[in-house]
């Protein structure tokens, strides 16, 4: 089931795919935004039958709540995982998003900006 974010946020990107156990998943990125989420954007986000992992972006720092999905499904090294999970001056926001794309690119993933 889709877990909706507690705060009002504007989706930045949406990644969907299939877990190794057959479940669908939904990886949704949000930027903090006081105006709310447009209905046409919400309509693109899958509903039941999907796992949802929120990505919070605030003040230039990005925090991914995707460790479980990364460890369970994708064989990525600790350096890549640390880049995605922690504040790291070596990578800016776009580099982290780019790395996430590369990590997921070898799988049956749909990526929306």
Predicted features and spans:
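Domain-length accessory/inserted modules outside core catalytic folds
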Residues: 1-25, 32-113
């Amino acid at each position: 089931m889709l877990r909706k974010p507690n705060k009002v946020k504007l989706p930045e990107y949406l990644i969907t795919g299939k877990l190794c156990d057959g479940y669908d998943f939904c990886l949704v990125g949000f930027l903090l935004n006081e105006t709310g989420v447009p209905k046409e954007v919400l309509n693109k986000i899958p509903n039941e039958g999907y796992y949802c992992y929120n990505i919070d972006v605030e003040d230039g720092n990005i925090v991914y709540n995707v460790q479980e999905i990364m460890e369970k499904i994708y064989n990525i090294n600790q350096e890549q995982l640390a880049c995605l999970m922690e504040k790291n001056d070596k990578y800016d926001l776009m580099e982290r998003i780019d790395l996430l794309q590369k990590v997921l690119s070898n799988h049956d993933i749909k990526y929306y900006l």
